């Protein structure tokens, strides 16, 4: 395909997303060429980044996340906090990961590589290299753009914490130099911590991925081009607007399944892409059914899913650390070949991770500082979705007469260690990873269910839909959520939300009995 024809097709694709583009201000535009090096367990990359200074200040330096450097050695902040363990999965000390920025320069301008330095805004750990800063020869004026050319090499760790490899399976997330968020004229670019996830600005991603011919590839966005190269590799090009990240996966043992999914009310038209490892083919229909349920529930309750694709990735056996993670238009789920039908763990993970495309993907919450705005709201949504499709009292387990709901499990979790921290706190400052998870997921989700029972389901439904519509493709704070809740309900809710979010409260549950005389 000639280059001019290819970009004409890309333009047509972009026009087809005009409904999306009208909602998002494109702060970043990434053009990335990536080559998978299976023997080296690495990715060689070249990046053209155009960044908009969407502030009223002159900006004289740029800050970037280098997330993979969390796995560079045992002195990084992530490794010090985790001791090499994440969600019970352990680091292989023979297979570290890192990102090497070989060159960074202004396109057709000065080389900035010599100005590169690592900074440590959160904890002062001089051995941490997950945030870099470069100085500019001239500041970027307000509402002006700068374009950079970056060359990098990303060595992937053996996967135990989201990104990495296991044999010939690759989950490639947080893999390129990613510019931080300029928020209120200041850089918001935190280090990578054990408890933190990610935060970035919206824009456009055009990414070319070259892999050996036997590999099956899935990635953020829609595939717009596929070229078979003379050396036996295949280059896949993906394009997506109105996203704040780009992730991809590759494995020769993936079986790819595609199916169109549509809804009339609200109107949804997307393509489901499932990459199922051949050892889990017996679980394919469970993946498909639960993903359809997720798309339907979130679309009907919050707003129609707007992207042309959604990709479900089933990680290889031996790579559970890659499972249960969200990226824009792509997520990883998890299962086991022996998973019984009455245990809905696979369904819960699939619906939960898809749901992040709303509360992390389209509503761009700052997961470093206010993780509950994603994790808690999504847990609330997950509980309601699971109850709808799998039973109010059996949404997690329904077998041999034993029934357990998602709600009951979340409540039990809070009764364990939920009292250690308030919900609203910098993610790396929680007492422990257990307290972080319990408070930002379970306690926050139950807080919203309690609010629903206080206000009524109809009012709460309007709050959630209004919040999603007002803050889609933007960066809200907890204050913004409270404002929406108060405007929709017509009530002062500061007493309720601030007590849950910022205070430590132990709720004592007393046995309540109905009075037959009333």
Give the ranges of each region predicted by the language model.
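Short, hydrophobic/aromatic-enriched beta-strand segments in well-ordered soluble domains
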Residues: 47-49, 64-68, 136, 144-158, ...
């Amino acid at each position: 395909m000639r280059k001019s024809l290819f970009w004409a097709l890309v333009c047509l694709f972009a026009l087809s997303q005009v409904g999306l583009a009208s909602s998002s201000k494109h702060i970043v535009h990434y053009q990335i060429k990536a080559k998978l090096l299976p023997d080296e367990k690495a990715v060689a990359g070249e990046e053209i980044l155009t960044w908009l200074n969407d502030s009223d200040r002159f900006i004289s330096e740029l800050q970037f996340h280098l997330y993979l450097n969390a796995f560079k050695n045992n002195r990084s902040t992530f490794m010090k906090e985790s001791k090499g363990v994440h969600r019970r999965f352990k680091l292989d000390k023979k297979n570290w990961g890192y990102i090497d920025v070989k060159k960074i320069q202004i396109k057709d301008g000065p080389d900035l590589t010599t100005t590169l330095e690592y900074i440590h805004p959160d904890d002062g750990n001089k051995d941490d290299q997950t945030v870099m800063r470069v100085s500019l020869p001239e500041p970027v004026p307000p509402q002006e753009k700068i374009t950079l050319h970056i060359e990098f090499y990303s060595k992937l760790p053996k996967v135990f914490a989201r990104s990495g490899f296991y044999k010939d399976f690759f989950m490639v997330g947080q893999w390129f130099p990613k510019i931080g968020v300029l928020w209120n004229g200041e850089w918001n670019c935190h280090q990578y911590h054990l408890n933190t996830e990610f935060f970035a600005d919206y824009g456009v991603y055009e990414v070319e991925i070259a892999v050996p011919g036997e590999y099956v590839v899935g990635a953020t966005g829609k595939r717009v081009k596929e070229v078979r190269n003379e050396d036996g590799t295949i280059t896949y090009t993906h394009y997506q607007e109105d996203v704040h990240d780009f992730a991809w996966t590759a494995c020769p043992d993936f079986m790819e399944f595609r199916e169109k999914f549509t809804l009339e009310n609200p109107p949804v038209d997307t393509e489901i892409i499932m990459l199922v490892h051949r050892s889990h083919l017996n679980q394919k229909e469970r993946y498909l059914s639960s993903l359809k349920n997720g798309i339907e529930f979130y679309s009907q309750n919050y707003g129609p899913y707007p992207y042309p694709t959604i990709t479900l990735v089933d990680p290889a056996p031996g790579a559970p650390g890659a499972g249960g993670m969200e990226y824009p238009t792509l997520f990883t789920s998890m299962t086991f070949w022996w998973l019984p039908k009455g245990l809905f763990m696979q369904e819960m993970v699939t619906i939960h991770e898809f749901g992040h495309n709303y509360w992390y993907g389209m509503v761009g919450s700052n997961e470093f500082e206010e993780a509950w705005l994603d994790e808690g709201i999504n847990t609330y949504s997950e509980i309601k979705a699971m109850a709808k499709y799998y039973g109010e009292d059996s949404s997690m387990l329904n077998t041999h007469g034993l029934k357990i709901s998602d709600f009951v499990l979340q409540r039990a979790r809070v009764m364990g260690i939920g009292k250690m921290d308030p919900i609203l706190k910098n993610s790396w400052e929680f007492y422990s990873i257990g307290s972080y998870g319990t408070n930002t997921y379970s306690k926050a989700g139950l807080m919203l269910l309690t609010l629903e029972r206080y206000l009524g389901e109809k009012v709460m439904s309007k709050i959630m839909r209004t919040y999603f519509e007002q803050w889609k493709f933007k960066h809200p704070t907890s204050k913004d959520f409270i404002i929406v809740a108060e405007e929709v309900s017509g009530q002062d809710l500061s007493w309720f939300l601030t007590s849950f979010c910022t205070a430590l409260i132990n709720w004592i549950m007393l046995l309540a009995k109905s009075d037959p005389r009333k």
